[in-house]
Amino acid sequence: MKLASLNTDANGDSYFTIVESCDPPESNKEREQEVAYWEIWETQPGYFQDFKPSEEPRSFAVLSGKLEITGSLGERRYFSRGDTFLLQDIGGKGHAIRTYGWEVCTVLRVTMKKIMTGTAKA
């Protein structure tokens, strides 16, 4: 499964890439990722968080609502119920988050022990 991932480059700018969450299909193995903890994060529509970097690498699974993530170079990605993505922009200029729509945005936020690497082929 391919996941959108927000990472940081050498200049501190955050950019989106794609990370493969599984080992190659012929291996028949799932890729394990150690986690520190998980939590449920809930916000009302219209919530806005200005640019800041992630404190730790995190995986997000949207359970309800809609949110927009903006990287430091202005690229925006939109996520809604059923979407899973990674915020791995440790340090640097960070990202902004905005929730929109009519329903509460509920997200399963999983803090990982290390950054998930392995860019997927397009």
Model-derived regions: residue spans:
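Short beta-strand segments in beta-sandwich/barrel cores
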Residues: 48-49, 65-70, 84, 114-116
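A short beta-strand-loop-beta hairpin characteristic of the jelly-roll/cupin
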Residues: 53, 59-81
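Conserved hydrophobic/aromatic beta-strand scaffold that supports enzyme active sites
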Residues: 16, 40, 59, 84-86, ...
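Ligand-binding loop in jelly-roll beta-barrel domains
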Residues: 74-83, 89-116
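Conserved short histidine dyad/triad with adjacent acidic residue
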Residues: 21-24, 34-54, 77, 88-92, ...
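A short, N-terminal "cap"/entry segment at the start of jelly-roll beta-barrel domains
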Residues: 1-41
